[in-house]
């Protein structure tokens, strides 16, 4: 199945493997992502006219808002970035400006394209690395040797390469030249400052500067892999493709958008810069040009998905212009006790499967009785009702509490099968959940 060519039905079927319920949210987002593919099949002139229908997801924390968008972007291999609206400040104030989310998207897009190109050249890179190490391990031939000696050397080199590829010489030490570690650049500063940073680095830190290091063959493989990748890859083409892909199929997920909404009830007491952040966000969502270190990017074809719990405010508390830029609205359901149980038993990589896999490393086989799983779901649901509702995240902490002693004393249980019963779950959690003063500690 072509990943970008997935139909809405296929997208929802994929999401069902990891996320229980939330049918309406899955359906809306599947259609929005499919429309990205449909648009790219049209004539260039018509493509420009069709802008994505941005989505506003409304639901409590832990119900699957981020996971739905992240999973689709991952399976379809689209540039994706998740940001939190509350982390941004109005232009003129100290803090991150909203344009940095677009720069983050472009960085992720370039990295995505680079990894794809590396995967295509994987065998070629591997061969070049092995050849370089083999030539280091095998002394070079002197000048003027006979053809027979040259053939013998070629055969020896081939055998050496085979041994390196099979890992036979991984522990042998060799001295190689590797590039000095590059200086990290802060990509969240404006492009003008980025260019100054890059120019200073070129002056004080020449790329060709190398240092000699003694490494094991295994370590040398990794060190040389990055260096040889850079020589084989077309950096400029990767940057251009990354920029283009971010522009045409990028996805920005803005979480906690309710935190920058100004409630009509408490408007005068709230941070006045919240509305300023909304107004700064507006041109980016509507469509504008943002300068990045890779070049300029137009934002009108980026898909924006905003999400928030809206406990203390309403979507209507956002400025009208911003509301209008998120025409599709989806309300996600709170998790019931039954859904909690299904999350533990029916998802492809459920929390239970994760803990079983982790403890199997120590030789401990963990089995959960069905009644124990139901009790976990029940107590997690009750904790959500009595304290702040954090959705499925509550399951992580309740299971962690139940398995805490077994995880700590894992070596004592090595080679054994441990069965988690309803009684064990109750003994670990019931007193904690029953006491409203203690329930807040089950995060």
Curated annotation (Swiss-Prot):
The keyword Chaperone applies. InterPro entries: AAA+_ATPase, ATP-dep_Clp_protease_ClpX, ATPase_AAA_core, Clp_ATPase_C, HslU, P-loop_NTPase. It holds the Pfam family AAA. Signal peptide: none annotated. The keyword Nucleotide-binding applies. Keywords: ATP-binding, Chaperone, Cytoplasm, Nucleotide-binding. GO terms for molecular function: ATP binding; ATP hydrolysis activity; peptidase activity; proteasome-activating activity. ATP binds at residues 20, 62-67, 255, 321, 393. GO terms for cellular component: HslUV protease complex. It comes from the Bacteria. GO terms for biological process: protein unfolding; proteolysis involved in protein catabolic process. ATPase subunit of a proteasome-like degradation complex; this subunit has chaperone activity. The binding of ATP and its subsequent hydrolysis by HslU are essential for unfolding of protein substrates subsequently hydrolyzed by HslV. HslU recognizes the N-terminal part of its protein substrates and unfolds these before they are guided to HslV for hydrolysis. NCBIfam families: hslU, PRK05201.1. A double ring-shaped homohexamer of HslV is capped on each side by a ring-shaped HslU homohexamer. The assembly of the HslU/HslV complex is dependent on binding of ATP. This is ATP-dependent protease ATPase subunit HslU. It comes from Helicobacter pylori (strain G27). The gene is hslU.
